[in-house]
């Protein structure tokens, strides 16, 4: 992980960042089949969604520009019954460590509203907070 904050600030300013957001959106929008899309661009040093969950969306696009990326589980790592029952993460994660999106990676997550996917949305969570003042910048598109 690159820790030079000067580099981080350069990446997050100006023309290059705007172009990247637009390029990602242009790839995402055709996948939505004309559905309404909501956009979030957030900066936080807090825990977002600490519990492993699935989204009640069609498709969610995530890209972390600063800080740790979204954690996710393969189907063979997850106890879906525990997840649906609201059990704690320790009962949902069956084996290994969660996979994690890297910084600048684009994740396209099928939610439970995706056709034929009602009980098979990607199980994921926000990464644990790195502490006060250690920010995460996340771009999210939902349909």
Located regions from the model:
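Extracellular structured ligand-interaction cores
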Residues: 36-38, 58-61, 67, 136-138
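A generic structural signal for short, solvent-exposed coil/turn residues
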Residues: 31-33, 56, 118, 131
């Amino acid at each position: 992980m690159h820790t030079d904050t000067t580099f981080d600030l350069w990446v997050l300013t100006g023309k290059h960042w705007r172009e990247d957001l637009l390029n990602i959106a242009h790839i995402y929008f055709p996948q939505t089949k004309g559905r309404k899309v909501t956009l979030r661009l957030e900066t936080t040093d807090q825990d977002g969604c600490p519990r492993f969950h699935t989204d009640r969306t069609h498709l969610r696009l995530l890209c972390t520009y600063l800080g740790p990326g979204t954690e996710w589980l393969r189907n063979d790592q997850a106890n879906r019954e525990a997840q649906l029952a609201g059990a704690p993460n320790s009962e949902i994660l069956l084996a290994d460590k969660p996979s994690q999106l890297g910084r600048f990676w684009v994740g396209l997550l099928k939610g439970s509203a995706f056709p034929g996917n009602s009980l098979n949305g990607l199980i994921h969570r926000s990464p644990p907070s790195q502490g006060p003042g250690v920010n995460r910048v996340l771009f999210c598109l939902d349909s």
